[in-house]
Amino acid sequence: FYAALLGWEVVFSDGDWACLGAPGAAQGAYPGITFQQNPAYLPPVWPEEPAAQQQMAHLDFAVDDLEGAVEYALHCGATEAAEQFSDGWRVMFDPAGHPFCLCAMKPVIESEHFALL
């Protein structure tokens, strides 16, 4: 799902583990995302509720065209959360039920005033 969504390459997959890399990146190069299969996985509850299964990680993807990105994510197999909290963000669920966000923040992130710590 994430390889299709991001246009990245599956650089390794053995059924239990999968590693994605940005196009043209050698295995082990960054950026990359590694996933582990978990047969006992339960999708997190979203929005979060006390004493309920919580997400272990959260991915936000900055995009140029929010509505186009939502349409593409749906095409790849995502679903849109029924509850949304902002016009500039869309909460989506991957096919396993894990939430991720698409956000119209790419111009901010790419500006000279933005820095990651």
Features from the language model and the residues they span:
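Terminal peptide-recognition signature
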Residues: Y2
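Vicinal oxygen chelate
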Residues: W8-H58, V70-P95, M105-L117
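Short hydrophobic/aromatic beta-strand micro-patches
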Residues: D60-A62
